[in-house]
Design a protein with these regions (language model features):
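Hydrophobic alpha-helical transmembrane segments
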Residues: 1-136
């Protein structure tokens, strides 16, 4: 059961938010290989590279929860699934709209994708901070 206290430590929410921002930068950019980035956008054969990319996100989220609240490490799987769904929907929308990086529509989709990932991380950061906040 996830128990959110009435008040969450400001320090914990700041630290958890920063941790998820760093995790996202690492997993979505630095640790994403060319195979993942190009492969997840293909009309066929997209599942293995997308699963690998989303798996990196999930593993890093699980690691954050393992450090603070091990019973909540399963949220890594939830993050991986959500991340994969968001990325796949963006890919399908880009293909349907036939947009490229030279068009504004591509960047609108990229912005929506990143915003949804950050919204996911906001929720996860709240849960991580709640788990780390000492009981009153």
């Amino acid at each position: 059961m996830i128990d959110i206290p009435d008040q969450i430590s400001t320090l914990w929410i700041a630290a958890a938010s920063a941790a998820f921002l760093a995790k996202h930068f690492l997993a979505d950019f630095l640790f994403q290989t060319d195979w993942m980035a190009a492969g997840k956008e293909k009309p066929r054969g997209w599942l293995p590279p997308l699963a690998a990319h989303a798996g990196v996100h999930g593993a890093m989220t699980a690691a954050l929860f393992l450090a603070v609240a091990p019973p909540l490490a399963w949220l890594g799987l939830a993050d991986a699934i959500l991340h994969g769904l968001i990325d796949r929907l963006k890919s399908l929308a880009a293909r349907r709209m036939r947009v490229t990086p030279r068009q504004a529509g591509f960047w609108w989709l990229f912005g929506a994708d990143q915003s949804l990932h950050h919204l996911t991380h906001l929720g996860l950061a709240i849960l991580l901070a709640a788990a780390g906040t000492p009981a009153a």
